[in-house]
């Protein structure tokens, strides 16, 4: 019917606008970075639970480790490992505030198989333990 077609057209328009907005935001977010760095940032974010080695990240963008590390640091202001740690802790913080998953499970999900090490790294980034972070988030 005409109503159904109108609804589908409206839905399609909304989806196109949302997609266009997402693409624009993505372009703005990465506009200051070269293609190798953009690819690396995206790869890291989508593979946080994997073992992320600099040598493999450099290979993915066909660069030597030293050139890759220099480029990454120059463009992001962080070393590759600092960026990985920051992103892992950011993702862990999201899980801590939005889920009831056990801390150890969250640590493992973001790439830390050793729970003690995860707690140590998280505490270094957020100045609090994952458990305390969760409690503080729940109070808000």
Which role fits each region the language model picked out?
Residues 1-42, 67-69:
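An amphipathic alpha-helical interaction segment
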Residues 12, 102-103:
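Hydrophobic alpha-helical connector segments
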Residues 15, 75, 92:
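DNA major-groove recognition helices of helix-turn-helix
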Residues 23, 45, 51-87, 99-101, ...:
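Basic/polar phosphate-binding segments, predominantly the helix-turn-helix DNA-binding elements
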Residues 40, 44, 89-92:
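Short alpha-helical "packing" element that flanks the helix-turn-helix/winged-helix DNA-binding module
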Residues 135-140:
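Generic C-terminal helix-cap and adjacent flexible tail
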């Amino acid at each position: 019917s005409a109503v159904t077609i109108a609804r589908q057209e409206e839905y399609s328009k909304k989806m196109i606008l949302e997609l266009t907005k997402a693409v624009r935001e993505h372009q703005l977010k990465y506009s200051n970075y070269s293609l190798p760095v953009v690819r690396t940032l995206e790869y890291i974010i989508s593979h946080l639970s994997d073992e992320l080695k600099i040598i493999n990240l450099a290979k993915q963008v066909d660069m030597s480790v030293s050139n890759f590390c220099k480029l990454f640091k120059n463009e992001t202001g962080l070393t590759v490992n600092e960026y990985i740690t920051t992103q892992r802790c950011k993702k862990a913080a999201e899980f801590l505030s939005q889920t009831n998953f056990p801390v150890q499970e969250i640590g493992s999900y973001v790439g830390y198989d050793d729970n003690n090490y995860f707690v140590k790294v998280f505490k270094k980034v957020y100045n609090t333990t994952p458990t305390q972070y969760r409690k503080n988030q729940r109070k808000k």
